[in-house]
């Protein structure tokens, strides 16, 4: 089995196993201690859409048309997406008999013909693009100018199940927890089958949100809280694999998509 856990804009030093003094990540530390820790690694692009296209296809994003000198990432008004002609890792594994699921941020085309279920995934649960998109223009001030987070309802980001919109705007303060629940359910439901799970968290891309359970969890403000919740999520996945006796036959990879963005006060 294969589990790929992908975070959005997380920095190399945002984990205690990489030396952060105030953000504690015991589950990621366990992965680093018990597994392999890769410290030299290239991302194919510094932004979301092309780096994800490269992950899914193993090809430079310019070869799949998922890179541009003008609009480097896809937006809610974009008509394009990852071409059907591209072969994804999900398609390869599905053809080999694997059950496949994508949970989280896709950002390779939000129209039905470009969603994960057309690219080799049996199921999809998540948001189709970045969590800061489709912002209500009537609301003034945001994390860039104030360092504070606007209510999640300001960002009219949809939550999809397969190709159906089930919530809009999605409650982003619960999204990490719900992604985790969906991932755990998929593992349990497919414990008798070989599977590929792609869990792509929306966080810690700004704006930042975390559940009430993790408010004040870190000494490093809301950014630290968000990383703490992601670490909890990793622990839930690892513990589920162990309880289902799948840990010895599952490869788990954790990585950020392309590293951190700019400096936004308490937002990373």
Label each residue range with its predicted role:
Residues 1-268:
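Formylglycine-dependent sulfatase
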